A protein has these predicted regions:
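Short, amphipathic alpha-helical "lid/cap" segments that border enzyme active or binding sites
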Residues: 81, 175-183
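Short beta-strand-centered segment that lines the nucleotide-binding/catalytic pocket of NTP-utilizing
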Residues: 25-38
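Small-molecule kinase domains that catalyze NTP-dependent phosphoryl transfer to phosphate-bearing small molecules
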Residues: 55-57, 131-176
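ATP-dependent small-molecule kinase phosphotransfer cores
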Residues: 37-92
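Glycine-rich phosphate-binding P-loop
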Residues: 4-20
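Conserved phosphate-donor/acceptor-positioning beta-strand/loop module used by diverse small-molecule
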Residues: 105-126, 130-142
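Divalent-cation
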Residues: 97
Length: 190
């Protein structure tokens, strides 16, 4: 099982898809949200919204599940953890984000990063209508939200090299280079 995390705009999703395709295993990325919603018995829009907000805490939660007063964030995280563990138990796969590196510490955990200009350039290729100036604050904001969410469940671990087996600078070697390094690493640890 391989987990992929990384900075916004680094190419982590594309790399995950490339790895899964090369290995002939399932890739779980955008489709995870629907599985988590079903597992947690919550609306899909709430799961997707959790990617856009800071995590709430038991004490300061605005949204609570009425019956047991568990915060919505915790309910969704527990469903997320259950889905990720189940998918990993079903066999080899590649799982994108959603604290999977914390949930599956024994997987091959990969972090993809790149300098800010590289990441902005990648996003502008997909969204040329966006300005470079607005993208800079957007990219940093997404990274901060992602870090806050993950650190609510694994303090101090998101983005730290000690958390991952491989940290790849996609801005230096490109996604093809990242794929080559990853496949070589996987061959070495089998």
């Amino acid at each position: 099982v391989i987990t992929i995390s990384g900075q916004h705009g680094s190419g982590r999703k594309e790399l995950g898809e490339m790895i899964a395709s090369s290995l002939g295993v399932p890739f779980y990325g955008d489709n995870l949200a629907a599985m988590i919603a079903e597992e947690g018995k919550v609306d899909l829009s709430l799961v997707e919204a959790m990617d856009q907000v800071e995590p709430d805490t038991e004490e300061a939660s605005v949204l609570h599940v009425a019956q047991n007063r568990t915060s919505l964030t915790k309910t969704i995280y527990q469903a997320q953890e259950s889905v990720i563990r189940r998918l990993a138990g079903e066999g080899p796969c590649v799982i994108l984000e959603r604290c999977s590196e914390t949930i599956l510490p024994d997987a091959v955990n990969i972090f993809v990063y790149g300098d800010l200009e590289y990441r902005i350039g990648r996003i502008m290729k997909v969204h040329p209508e966006l300005s470079r100036y607005s993208l800079k604050s957007h990219v940093l904001s997404v990274d901060n939200r992602r870090k806050s969410y993950c650190e609510a469940y694994a303090p101090g671990k998101w983005g730290r090299m000690e958390t991952y087996d491989i940290c790849l600078n996609a801005g230096l070697v490109g996604l093809d280079g990242c794929l080559k390094v990853t496949l070589e690493y996987i061959r070495g640890v089998r």
